[in-house]
Amino acid sequence: HYDPSIKKILPHSKMYTIQIGNERFILSGASLSSDAPSYFTNYFSQSANSDQVLFIDRSPRIFQYIYSHLQGYHVEIDDADTFTGLFSDALYYHLPQLRQLILNSDYYYANIGGESIKVSKKLLSGRGNTPNFFTVANDSLYKDISDIITDMNWIRPPPQAAPSLNRSPILFKELVHMLQGAEPEIRSPEHRRSLIKEAKYYRFNALAEKLQNIIEVYNPFTGAQEIAVSLDSIN
């Protein structure tokens, strides 16, 4: 739970300068102590370094998120590459609270067909649709490597890319809409088969079964083929 108290690891009112790449950031001792012990507090706690500029060769764009986090703001992450970069730097800077916030994020992130996808963990945790690709990938890519890096005490985390899939982002979004409760909009038998194939790929087994229970029927009153859904597949 949230604890507003801040340990006095560094003098709270003293300002410290950190240069990340080609950008400088100034943070108070209170901000740096709010997520500690860390790379920063370990450095500035040494008397010889207390008035020095700390130079670090990492991404200033990613550090903007860390800067906001240390100041006490909620950090909103919109894309998979930023999520993965922030996770790597939370490990690099030894920020325990940020690491836990990322691992306990409410969202899964991935690059699907070249498009960044952000989807609610709660949405993908429904009965019959979990475990799935995202639950397994999230644990293996983020949680497991986090534990390994911590245990091995590496100087910096290895290069890491967000989960990337050569699948259709359009079909994935349609599956997500169905998981949100929307009725399937089946345009053709081929479209239905594609949706079933994608649902099975992601291990959305209950959704795949629902799609398999959709049948085409001929309506003699309209003279057209229509989509019908078995009553057994409607929750």
Locate predicted features.
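BTB/POZ-protein C-terminal extensions
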Residues: S116-K197, Q212-N235
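BTB/POZ (also called T1 in voltage-gated K+ channels) oligomerization domain detector
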Residues: H1-Y67, G72-L165
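Hydrophobic, ordered structural segments
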Residues: S68-H74, D78-L101, L175-E183, R187-N219
